[in-house]
From Swiss-Prot:
Gene expressing this chain: rluC
EC number: 5.4.99.24
Annotated InterPro entries: PsdUridine_synth_cat_dom_sf (IPR020103), PsdUridine_synth_RluA-like_CS (IPR006224), PsdUridine_synth_RsuA/RluA (IPR006145), RluA_PseudoU_synthase (IPR050188), S4_RNA-bd (IPR002942), S4_RNA-bd_sf (IPR036986)
Source taxonomy: Bacteria, Pseudomonadati, Pseudomonadota, Alphaproteobacteria, Rickettsiales
Catalyzed reactions per annotation: uridine(955/2504/2580) in 23S rRNA = pseudouridine(955/2504/2580) in 23S rRNA
CDD domains tied to this protein: PseudoU_synth_RluA_like, S4
Family assignment from sequence similarity: Belongs to the pseudouridine synthase RluA family.
Protein name per Swiss-Prot or TrEMBL: Ribosomal large subunit pseudouridine synthase C
Lineage: superkingdom: Bacteria
Key word Isomerase present: yes
Domain S4 RNA-binding: 11-70
């Protein structure tokens, strides 16, 4: 059997094969390559070989490909309802490459322990209906605002690379409890995430953490020691803005993880909103500048 690679994005041979045949294990692929039961362009290949569009992967007849039997996917009414909202009520932008939604606070981006409903589970329903949506980045469950979703594999690779190469600029608006130590500036720390624990700030020279940089600007004073602050993350570490806000002496209002429980008044919501995203022209050939409307509860403060 000959498989002609049809993806314009270069990919490792082993990863390409496992996308086509999810039941293939890494060990089986490498053994088949050693025995020349799988070759590329009539030559012996390594698992790390990057295949591109037009390459021919030959799989010997003696090699038994593990084919997964199709299973019937079952979706809950909540997942189907959420899927409809993603393509209507939450949708704020769509082109050939991406959609952008205004994710409400309280909705998880991905599933996990004790999470039964998420954007990802709704996308799986849409994909079962013929779409090919792929998550590329995430927002915390408590954070509202702009979430970009790729419409196909090629777009997902381009978008993933864009985040990595800093071709995506994100701006967040937050209501903080307390005023930042300066009206504007830069926060630069390391953030360490250990398995089973929440992220924490560490010294900039700590080799265990990863560099985290955030620009911030005080926009206005509100009331009752509340302030509107703009945050621009240069890096994308887990809980980065929440940790940096706390470090600045102004935890995000409603943040029950990093806020000051003894001083900060109770709030049902965490007031952190992904307000604006700008995609460089280099990503899809045109600049995309998107803005997500603030949730109504922001108006109450």
């Amino acid at each position: 059997m000959i498989i002609t690679v049809n993806s314009p994005i270069a990919s490792r041979l082993d990863k390409y094969l496992r996308r086509l045949y999810p039941l293939l294990t890494q060990g089986v692929i490498e053994k088949a390559l050693r025995q020349k039961q799988i070759i590329v362009n009539s030559k012996k290949a390594e698992a790390s070989l990057r295949v591109v569009e037009g390459d021919e992967i030959f799989i010997h007849d003696k090699f038994n490909l593990p084919i997964a039997q199709p299973t019937k996917l079952v979706f809950t009414d909540a997942e189907i309802t959420l899927a409809k909202k993603i393509t209507t009520e939450y949708l704020i932008y769509e082109d050939d490459n991406i959609i952008a939604i205004n994710k409400p606070a309280g909705l998880a981006t991905q599933g996990g322990s004790k999470i039964n409903l998420s954007v990802d589970s709704a996308l799986k329903y849409l994909n079962s209906q013929g779409a090919d949506f792929k998550l590329v980045h995430r927002l915390d469950k408590e954070t509202s605002g702009l979430l970009l979703i790729a419409k196909n594999y090629v777009s997902s690779v381009k978008l993933h690379d864009a985040f990595k190469e800093k071709l995506v600029e994100k701006t967040y608006l937050a209501v903080t409890y307390g005023k930042p130590i300066k009206d504007q500036g830069e926060v630069k720390t390391n953030i360490e995430k250990s398995k089973g624990s929440i992220p924490k700030i560490t010294d900039i020279n700590d080799n265990n953490g990863k560099l985290a940089i955030t620009y911030y600007k005080l926009l206005k004073s509100l009331t009752n020691n509340l302030f509107l602050v703009e945050f621009i993350p240069i890096t994308g570490r887990m809980h980065q803005l929440r940790l940096h806000a706390k470090l600045l002496g102004c935890p995000i209002f409603g943040d029950n993880k990093y806020g000051n429980d003894k001083l900060m008044p109770y709030s049902k919501y965490m007031f952190l909103h992904a307000n604006n995203i700008v995609l460089s022209k280099k990503v899809f050939g045109k600049e995309v500048n998107l803005e997500a409307k603030l949730p109504s509860y922001f108006n109450r403060v």
